Amino acid sequence: VDSDIDPGYREIKGRRWRISDPSIPEPLRQQLVNELMSARRAVAAANRTSNAIALRTARRRVQSAKTALGERGPKWWRPMNDQEWTVRATATLFSLLNNRQANASLCPSEVARASDGRHWRKRMPDVRLLAEEMTHTARLCITCRGEPVSISTRGPVRLARGERFDDYFSGENDA
């Protein structure tokens, strides 16, 4: 594979492998890699115990982390349309939050930077809209100073786990 022609792949031992998006800031990339490794360990553990539900959940976590890293899903080296960006941003949001402690939150700009590094500023309104949609399913909670608020709240907001956060990985209530 000629990386000048197809920059999203690298050939290793004769096989093409999709590489991570190099525009993801290093601290966020590392968090996503940590989530991917944790999810892979969860797949192995579920396989050892023959737990089908845990296996499905762990595989969804792997898919989400790989999509957030740009290794699956929309091709990061090509311009993404809004639908493709939403797929990647959703995976990024849930993977970053899942990698953090249960009571932790993240800044909307972290989602924007990791999901569309080159154009993250223009994606900020999109992240806020995506977050608002996730509050309707209780998968996400928008907070300011630790208190739930509306997305229309002026000033800095944070994104935290909602009551049904885990439904994203379990597949419950998939639309």
Name every feature range the model reports, one short phrase each.
Residues 1-9:
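Short acidic, Pro/Gly- and aromatic-enriched capping/linker segments at domain boundaries
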Residues 29-46, 65:
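Non-transmembrane amphipathic alpha-helical segments
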Residues 64-79:
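Amphipathic alpha-helical coiled-coil segments
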Residues 85-105, 126, 130-136:
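Positively charged, polyanion-binding regions of nucleic-acid-associated proteins
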Residues 103-114:
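Short acidic, hydrophobic short linear motifs in intrinsically disordered regions
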Residues 112-124:
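Short helix-coil junctions and helix-kink-helix linkers
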Residues 135-144:
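A short, conserved structural fragment
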Residues 145-171:
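Short, cationic-aromatic polyanion-contact patches
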